[in-house]
Amino acid sequence: MVYSKQSDDNFVKIDTLPTYYKNAVIAVEDHRFEKHGAIDFIAIGRAIVRNISNFKLLEGGSTITQQVANNLYFIEEDVNPILRKVAEIFVAFDLEKQYSKNEILELYINTIYFGNGYYGVKEACNGYLNKDPKDMTLYDATMLAGIPNAPSVYAPTVNPDLTRSRQEKVIQSMVKYGYLSQEEADKLILNDN
């Protein structure tokens, strides 16, 4: 196993998690995860066009695999960002050779930062929800899946209204990519847990 910020006690096997959590993560973070390799040229192209046309950095094009590469191997923040991105791409290609998509997703959910010092889904579930990851509800899953995009903004302890707004984006992404029906999404949004 590769280096992880998680202790063995906090590492969660992906097959113990509710399927809807995995689906929420894929829908909001990398909806083409199962279809592309280490990098997604379509997402990168879209990000470049959008960023250039708006004259600012609005979105990235990193895949889940690239995020795993970054989480596991690139600790130093003061590295040249272009060199770091190139190295991240090479590491991502290597990860895709060594691990299945399921294993990469497992590494992602165990190393991603959720804010408040919580690394990985187990710490986030325990810290924010006071429950074990296997016990999270669909509502919980959609909230947690939205946090890693910007933990300092979307953590529920920071701004519950922004957390809720981001959660609704996750829910709508799940509808868009076929993981939830619009009826299920509407009930979830109205239910408020």
Describe each region flagged by the PLM.
Residues 1-193:
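Juxtamembrane regions of bacterial inner-membrane/periplasmic proteins
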